[in-house]
């Protein structure tokens, strides 16, 4: 059985985009704005594109989206709203690359 290979390289989110997403989450739901640790943010944003021996550690778009969610939530770079931001970043990455989550608000929560 052959594996399905993406025809194009996904578009990844840059730090400025993620900071805007975080700001929107804080404005909408409340919390303390700001970055607690820039290094943790940079590390989390590098994970979806991480390689080992020229092989992607997260080779599929779904694994890359999961990497955004996991690393932003588990290594919290922001003062507040880390899990909310992680979910919103994952959703933005998927949308940027032509995918949509099919979840109710209750399922997403």
Residue ranges and their predicted role:
Residues 1-109:
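FIC/Doc superfamily catalytic core
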